Amino acid sequence: MGVAGSIASYLIRHAQGCLLVESGPGSTQAALQARLAEHGLRLADVSDVFLTHIHLDHAGAAGWLARQGARIHVHPAGAPHLLDPEKLLSSAARIYGDLMDTLWGQFLPVPEEQLSVLQDGQVVTVGGVSLQAVETLGHAEHHFVYLFDDV
C-alpha cells in the first residue's frame, strides 16, 4: 500500500505466456510491466488473471489487464463489482479519502466478455496449467484460493 514497486501478484508461466494470481492495485501498473519485462514478458503475454477476492490491493488492476487482453476469473459474489465498481469505489473512498489515487490508482470495470465467473471446485486449464478454485470464505465473503497440481 503506497510502497513503490509493491505488487500482490504471483506469476505462473504456461505454454502460451503466463497467468497471474491477483492483478495488484491499479497504482502498480508500471511496476507490473517492469517486472514482467525482467522475465522477458509483455502485457500481451498475460492470458489470465485469477483473483482471490476483489479488494483494491488484489484486484485493482484487473480491468486494465482485461483491456490488454487478459481474461479475469473471480468468485460469483465479486463479479458484479468488477463489471460496475462504483459501489466498491465509493465505499473505499469513505475509508481512504484523498489517498485513493495514490494507494490504489485507477480501477477500471472489467468488460463482461473478459470476465469468467468460477464456482467452488471448478478446474480451469490455461496453457497446460490446471488449477482449482476453492472457496475459502473469511477474509472476504467472496474469497477463493487456487490449488495448482503442477506448480
Segments and roles (model prediction):
Residues 27, 57, 80, 87:
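Short alpha-helical
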Residues 21-24, 47-53, 74-75, 135-138, ...:
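Active-site neighborhood of phospho(di)ester-bond hydrolases with catalytic His/Asp-centered motifs
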Residues 1-39, 43, 146-151:
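Conserved beta-strand hairpin/beta-sheet module of binuclear metal-dependent hydrolase folds
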Residues 11-13, 120-150:
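Core dinuclear metal-dependent hydrolase active-site scaffold
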